[in-house]
Amino acid sequence: MIRQMLTSLAALALAAPLAAQEVTPDPTDWAAITGAAEGQTVYWHAWGGSNAINDYIAWAGDEVAGRYGVTVEHVKLKDTADAVSRVIAEKSAGKDSGGAVDLIWINGENFAAMKEQGLLYGPWAEDLPNWQYVDVEGKAAVTSDFTVPTEGLEAPWGMAQIVFYHDTARLAEPPRSIPALLDWAQDNPGRFAYPQPPDFLGSTFLKQAVMELAPDPSVLTKPVSEESYHEATAPLWDYLDDLTPNLWRGGAAYPQSGPRLIQLMNDGEIDLALSFNPNEPSNAIANFELPGTVRSYVLDGGTIGNASFVAIPYNANATAGALVLANFLLSPEAQAHKQDPAVWGNGTVLAMDELSAQDRARFDAIELGVATLTPAELGEALPEPHPSWMVRLEQDWTARYGVGQ
């Protein structure tokens, strides 16, 4: 899908230059931005598959409405590419202002596609007042999205890293490498599942596996080529050929999302699963969606991590309001609220040593859940492959193993 998107975008770029927005707020004039934002409605296109995340977005919307007079409408997505396609359709129709999408929760290949074809407003992120708190030195992912420099075209708002989780009442010693996972699955058929790509968690499992199995993982940081792709992925397909018949339902069906994995474990159908939020198992336990015996861990060789971003399309109708919302999402208050496992449990992008004592206290007061790893236990996250790898992996996985929705 992303490859088709890029082809369409390239054709559009050749057909006509991008028109400027009728009104483009100056990101450095914050007083003017907040003034222009008042009364605007921001249509924030964001994944809507988690109640905890949806509740957080609703909370953020209530806060910016009360403080700045900005209304936030959460347009719930199953796939971020749907929002990108909407912007492409508007570009094709010549709608270069007044677009339907004001803010997108985005990263990876979707950001790369929009950046390449000039479909993003900006740069603006580093002009936000709350940018001063972002941990640029300690978290390289906040300025490099799947190896693609962000260059101020998107603002980070959360950190994520793969964790595996298991019910210790049924699985005391889980597998701690990708090869060991296969051995365990063959001995315990039907007790592991991952979501069906292109669900982002399912696709991330493929990337985690190929990083561990590829003869030379360093090639994954560069744009994919035919030669590098076939050499790096041959062990992955051999691995999945062996793993698939030992998955939940014998690989004949796949969960459609991370929340579905939680439900399967709670129902006793699987013993091992994964999440891209280290706090999600604790959050689920707190909400009585998982048994209290569930615990999380990372693989011995480390796990993939990245940052989540928000971006503003070039033709957004409420650019000022989107800037105000993005800035609020970077505030210590919003970041600490989001990191609380009882709320969402998503990691902060802020540097603690840049915060006031009062704001640091917000984070110090957060209690880690029973299934949440400490930063030391998580370890340093492995970098994401270049986004072009994800496109190819999803296409080939679907051709080899894809099943009907």
Where do the model's predicted regions map?
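Periplasmic-binding protein-like
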Residues: 160, 239-243, 289-311, 360
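Mature extracytoplasmic/periplasmic domains
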Residues: 303-304, 308-377
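Short, polar/charged alpha-helical segment
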Residues: 27-38, 42-45, 50-71, 164
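Extracytoplasmic ligand-binding site segments that recognize negatively charged/polar headgroups
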Residues: 47-59, 74-82, 97, 101, ...
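A ligand-binding cleft/hinge motif common to bilobed small-molecule-binding domains
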Residues: 111-113, 274-291
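Gram-negative bacterial Sec-dependent N-terminal signal peptides
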Residues: 1-20
